[in-house]
């Protein structure tokens, strides 16, 4: 009925098969988790690029309108981005406001040539951008991200001003 010599060998082999299966399954799980996290982060970074493109189009559109023209802007951002900031290096930059958001942000803003930042700054490889015709009413103008960012753009003749709603 049972061949004892084969059964003994099979019993010795079975734990190794189970261990090997567990190791392979855990490696597949870890690799899948890593790939999915990277895809989600890449998607969020792409959404930042779309946000920048949409904002740049709005600024260019209202720059070409008459002085005093304004619009409410509502753009979407990924939840991992805490703040959307606009700043001008040409005017006084309020260090205390930036320190409330993130310590060290003032140093980052004073060293770059861009005027738009997504905080945390290092979340995406490209989190600093420049729109030449855009100036904030407050310096810096940082808006808390709730999934959507709301602010007003107004043509001031030589530039487009951004302010909180």
Language-model region placement:
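Long, compositionally biased, intrinsically disordered regions
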Residues: 2-3, 16-165
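Juxtamembrane loop-transmembrane helix junctions in multi-pass integral membrane proteins
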Residues: 11-15
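N-terminal leader/signal peptides at the extreme start of proteins
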Residues: 1-10
């Amino acid at each position: 009925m049972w061949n004892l010599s084969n059964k003994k060998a099979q019993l010795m082999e079975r734990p190794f098969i189970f261990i090997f299966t567990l190791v392979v399954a855990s490696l597949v799980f870890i690799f899948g988790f890593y790939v999915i996290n990277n895809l989600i982060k890449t998607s969020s970074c792409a959404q930042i690029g779309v946000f920048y493109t949409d904002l740049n189009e709005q600024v260019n559109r209202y720059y070409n309108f008459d002085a005093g023209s304004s619009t409410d802007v509502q753009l979407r951002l990924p939840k991992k981005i805490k703040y959307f900031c606009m700043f001008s290096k040409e005017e006084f930059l309020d260090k205390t406001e930036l320190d409330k958001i993130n310590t060290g942000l003032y140093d980052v803003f004073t060293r770059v040539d861009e005027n738009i930042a997504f905080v945390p700054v290092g979340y995406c490889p490209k989190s600093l951008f420049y729109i030449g015709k855009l100036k904030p009413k407050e310096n810096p103008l940082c808006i808390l991200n709730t999934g959507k960012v709301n602010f007003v753009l107004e043509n001031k003749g030589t530039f487009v001003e951004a302010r909180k709603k």
